[in-house]
Amino acid sequence: MNKIYIVGMGPGFESMMTKQAIDALEASDVIVGYTVYIKLLGEKFQTKELLTTPMRQEKERCHLCFKKALEGKTVSLVCSGDAGIYGLASLMYEIGQEYDNVELSVIPGITAANSGAAVLGAPLNHDFCTISLSDLLTPWDKIEKRLVAAAEGDFVIALYNPSSHKRKDYLMRACDILLRAIEPDRACGYVKNIGREGTSYTVCTLGELRSAQVNMFTTVFIGNEGTQIIDGKLVTRRGYQIE
């Protein structure tokens, strides 16, 4: 049966890819992905047939994978982070209903919530949720409801897609929503370019986060009531009693 791997490539550097992901890419004849992600693979896979599509051509990218697989080639579709977390794994299964004799296999990767948390310290050490601020596929009113529910439930929150060229004020809007239920001195932080050249992080308060300059390669963390700043790192208490 024809084979397609749906590969989570992690945040960027090869060192942060799982061995399973590298093995899948090495076993593939064709690697398909968003232009930026293919460039991140570097020289290691240049002997493969590399096919790219620009942003917002996700459906075309998925169909391309199936067409190549039906030519008898083993295909990998690469997604940043984990393919099943804001990636293309679900879309591949949906589109796959149109094609026969193609086996799909999802290869997990390190998502930005995990890799970004490691840079910041230990902000996800208790219950947490992830929320994307992109309204391309989810209406803003639903995003707002999720922000409110997360704040009221005292979850640590990892925000994906906090800004873009067309959504420059979305993080500010999200902070304004959270500030209705959370005090402005709540410990927060954000990481830019996780696992790539120029990785940097900032620890701040929710009030300060409101005016932070972020982009689409930034992941934002809002702490819960038990989150504190220790030696410049963002740490959420698990609940152990320390004497």
What are these regions (language model features)?
Residues 4-6, 152-243:
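A contiguous loop/helix-start segment that scaffolds small-molecule binding in enzyme catalytic cores
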Residues 85-153:
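Class I SAM-dependent methyltransferase SAM-binding "motif I" and its flanking Rossmann-like core
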Residues 10-16, 137-140, 201-204:
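Short gly/ser/thr-rich secondary-structure transition/capping motifs
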Residues 1-104, 115:
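Class I S-adenosyl-L-methionine
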Residues 73-79, 123-133, 207-216:
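A polyampholytic, Gly/Pro-enriched intrinsically disordered region
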